[in-house]
Design a protein with these regions (language model features):
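P-loop NTPase switch/coupling surface
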Residues: 1-170, 180, 188
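Short, charged low-complexity intrinsically disordered segments located at boundaries
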Residues: 75-84, 223-229, 267
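Extended helical coiled-coil dimerization/tether regions that scaffold
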Residues: 1-3, 155, 159-243, 247-264
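Hydrophobic positions in the central parallel beta-sheet of the AAA+
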Residues: 12, 264-266
């Protein structure tokens, strides 16, 4: 960012998106919980929120910090996507309004990228300000271009994380991580054990080693440490799901050691 100001999403407004009309809610400083019955679009909302920010940088596990909506959800050419109106407002750490992005949809099916989201700077909530001026302010104050993401490292954990390890063993690849790897150098193994054992006490022994798990059905690789009395491919969905969430937190933990780190977003 231009002056290294820390930004965070503070408000999400959905004027129109599929079955959502005139829906808006605040986003918490540290955590936001979206609840509801199955099939209403909760995962869609989370992925939309993740589409306004990102960083074109690889994590230690190989995934990037810039999730694309079309990688997880399909927008059909027959949809009225040009009429969708969604706005994400970002504030500085002290709550000072910073900028708003309209999540617009662009048809890139001819280039094989599908219909994807472009976060465009908007002047919707700024009195007496032209769109051009809003774009200039966002660029000068926060180094955010008119059609660019807000520079917050972002991870979206899709529901593919719930795919059971043992259901399709032939699509799962498990590789032990060497002791010289950055994960061990930065004590990520200790963090993994600590966080996992806080949720499910006495699950991972001190001598357990880190492995990298790649599922054919999941875009993100994850970390794994053997659980007491439970072979890797025999983990429950809940145990594996917890491991996936902690893996994402480890990605952020590793990123936090960079001098320029200024927060991250996990959806």
């Amino acid at each position: 960012m231009g002056v290294n100001k820390k930004l965070r999403p503070e408000h999400f407004s959905v004027e129109y998106f599929r079955n959502f009309k005139e829906v808006s809610f605040e986003l918490g400083r540290k955590i936001t919980v979206i609840s509801g019955q199955n099939g209403v679009g909760k995962s869609n909302l989370l992925s939309l929120i993740a589409s306004g920010s990102g960083l074109n940088k690889k994590s230690v596990l190989g995934s990037n910090f810039q999730p694309e909506f079309y990688e997880f959800f399909n927008v059909d050419e027959d949809e009225d996507f040009e009429s969708y109106k969604l706005y994400l407002t970002y504030v500085e750490d002290d709550g000072t309004p910073a900028l708003t992005k309209r999540l617009s949809f662009k048809d890139d099916t001819k280039t094989g990228r599908g219909i994807r989201i472009i976060p465009r700077t908007s002047n919707i909530y700024i009195d007496n300000c032209t769109l051009k001026q809003a774009e200039i302010n966002a660029k000068n104050e926060y180094d955010v271009g008119g059609a660019a993401r807000v520079k917050i490292p972002t991870i979206y954990l899709s529901l593919s994380r719930l795919y059971p390890l043992g259901e399709r063993k032939d699509t799962v690849k498990i590789t032990e991580i060497r002791k010289k790897n950055a994960f061990y150098q930065r004590k990520a193994d200790e963090k993994y054990k600590e966080w996992y054992n806080v949720v499910i006490p006495n699950s991972i022994k001190s001598e357990a080693v880190l492995s990298k798990v790649e599922k054919g059905a999941c875009a993100r690789a994850s970390l794994h440490m053997d659980i007491n009395n439970t072979p890797t491919l025999s983990q429950s969905i809940g145990q594996d799901n917890l491991g996936n969430i902690i893996s994402a937190l480890i990605d952020i933990y590793m990123l936090s050691m960079d001098d320029e780190y200024n927060g991250a977003l996990l959806c």
